[in-house]
Design a protein with these regions (language model features):
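AMP-forming adenylation/ATP pyrophosphatase catalytic core
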Residues: 3-12, 17-34, 55, 90, ...
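Internal, active-site/partner-interface "lid" segment
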Residues: 218-222, 243-253
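Residue-level recognition of short, well-ordered coil/turn positions
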Residues: 48-51, 240, 333, 420
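Core alpha/beta nucleotide-donor-binding catalytic domains of modification enzymes
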Residues: 1-237
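A general alpha-helix detector
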Residues: 133, 227-231, 247-248, 302, ...
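Inter-helical turn/loop segments and adjacent helix faces that build the functional surface
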Residues: 235-245
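Alpha-helix N-capping/helix-start residues
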Residues: 68, 198-199, 242, 288, ...
Length: 448
């Protein structure tokens, strides 16, 4: 019996990941490269069978002169296939790491464009899994970093930055349906090609006489992934190929799931959200004695998840500084990491937002306006939502009993009318429900 072809494998993958009741509309992120163009053709054939409407999006990062023409190539292919297509343009502001900024910008743009669509297909392949495994192995990653990328992953991009695209930049026919009133924020990345090899997808495209673009940066040894790709080719000659590495990463994913289950159990017993004056502070309190009694791996997982939860960061902190912070915490000290601060206070460890990371951030309050990735004041239009800071702290003459100490209170969310403090519910200023906490998804499945 012959092996199933790419279309049959894609249908099986989609059935496993999203079936049997498929959504009526699904988005595809298509760059124009071989992997994503193969996914477009595979999804086209699959969608015609299952009656699913596809919405295709390309993010033009503007980093190469050819990028606009490549996006137009994708748009032309979509027109020929009969699917709506939108090009979203991202421009780097020069701040931070370029690749990280491009990734975050891409997700934020897609999130604003997707409307009510809940699923976006991405074209990561088995080669991507193997290359990522080798890259992280070279950095000394543990189970967390070496585990295979998830076939489904919930994403909730930061929404406190100014909108990077205007509605009129997207043609009406390329705008997906609007979200419903009960739709939760964020979307799911779905990766149906993790079992496919890059070379097989290009063979599929050649058979179809399909078009794709080879990004010249894929041959630039200045990029770590390009060097890793060449290393993988040499390893395959010695019998250590992408299939073996991807299978190892998948086994480590199962080990990670077991470790996460243990961390969830411990966190439920020893970690609690902090409140003051009947309002959430956005901080976490960890029982010192209970936390100290569990195994190191569980401690690290809980601490990493706590830092992610408090900072709304999409990724956990790096292993080495995380381990150093844990040692200081267990010895009664503390420190800063991942935009957070940790301090030992009596019988608890307090994990709170680092004021220095928030000092220069603010947003105009109002419905749908999120500050620091998790705070909203829908009924306070016209006011500014920002950190309390030393200036706001000084305006509160009587500090309530049991309130967070000054070093933590400076990072509390507050509403201002220019320089005048209007509300800081966690310190008894204004109504307790003046601000609402919309925490991100549970990091590593550990809910607080």
């Amino acid at each position: 019996m012959s092996e199933p072809g790419p279309d049959a494998r894609f249908a099986a993958s989609m059935g496993t990941l999203m079936g049997p009741e498929f959504p009526s509309d699904i988005a595809l992120a298509v760059s124009g490269g071989g992997d994503s163009m193969a996914m477009l053709y595979l999804a086209h054939n699959w969608a015609r069978v299952w009656g699913v409407r596809l919405w295709v999006v390309t993010v033009d990062h503007g980093l190469r002169p050819e990028s606009a023409a490549e996006a137009e190539m994708v748009a032309g292919t979509c027109r020929a296939l009969g699917w709506p297509h939108a090009t979203l343009r991202w421009r780097w502001d020069g701040a931070g790491n370029l690749q990280d900024a491009a990734r975050r910008g891409r997700l934020a743009l897609i999130d604003r464009w997707r409307g009510g669509l809940r699923h976006v297909l991405f074209a990561h392949t088995m080669d991507d899994v193997a290359e990522t495994f080798l890259m992280r192995l070279s950095r000394g990653s543990g189970v967390e970093g070496l585990s295979a990328m998830a076939a489904r992953r919930a994403v909730r991009p930061h929404m406190d930055a100014p909108p990077p695209l205007a509605p009129d930049e997207i043609a009406t026919e390329a705008r997906p349906p609007a979200p419903g009133p009960d739709d939760a924020p964020g979307f799911e990345i779905v990766r149906p090609l993790l079992g496919e090899r890059r070379e097989d997808l290009r063979f599929y495209l050649r058979v179809l006489k399909g078009r794709w673009i080879e990004d010249p940066s894929n041959e630039d040894p200045g990029f770590e992934r390009v060097r890793t790709r060449r290393l993988l080719a040499r390893l395959e000659e010695e019998g250590l190929g992408a299939e073996t590495l991807a299978a190892t990463a998948d086994r480590l994913s199962r080990a990670r799931a077991a470790l996460e289950a243990r961390a969830r159990e411990v966190a439920a017993r020893f970690v609690a959200r902090a409140e003051s004056c009947g309002a959430p502070t956005g901080e976490l309190l960890i029982d010192r004695d209970g936390f100290a009694a569990v195994e190191t791996d569980t401690q690290l997982r809980i601490l990493a998840a706590a830092l992610q939860w408090v900072s709304s960061a999409p990724y956990r902190p790096r292993a080495r500084p995380l381990e150093a912070l844990l040692v200081r915490a267990l010895s009664g000290g503390g420190g800063t990491l991942h935009g957070c601060e940790l301090r030992a206070e009596g019988e608890v460890l307090r994990v709170f937002r680092e004021y220095a990371a928030l000092r220069d951030t603010s947003t105009r309050a109002g419905p749908g306006r999120i500050w620091d990735g998790r705070w909203e004041a829908p009924g306070a239009e016209g006011l500014t939502l920002r950190a309390l800071g030393p200036d706001g702290w000084a305006q509160i003459a009587q500090k309530p009993a049991g309130a967070p100490p000054a070093h933590a209170a400076h990072a509390l969310p507050a509403l201002f009318d220019h320089a005048r403090l209007v509300a800081c519910p966690a310190l008894g200023q204004g109504r307790p429900d003046a601000l609402s906490l919309r925490p991100p998804r549970a990091p590593a499945g550990i809910g607080f």
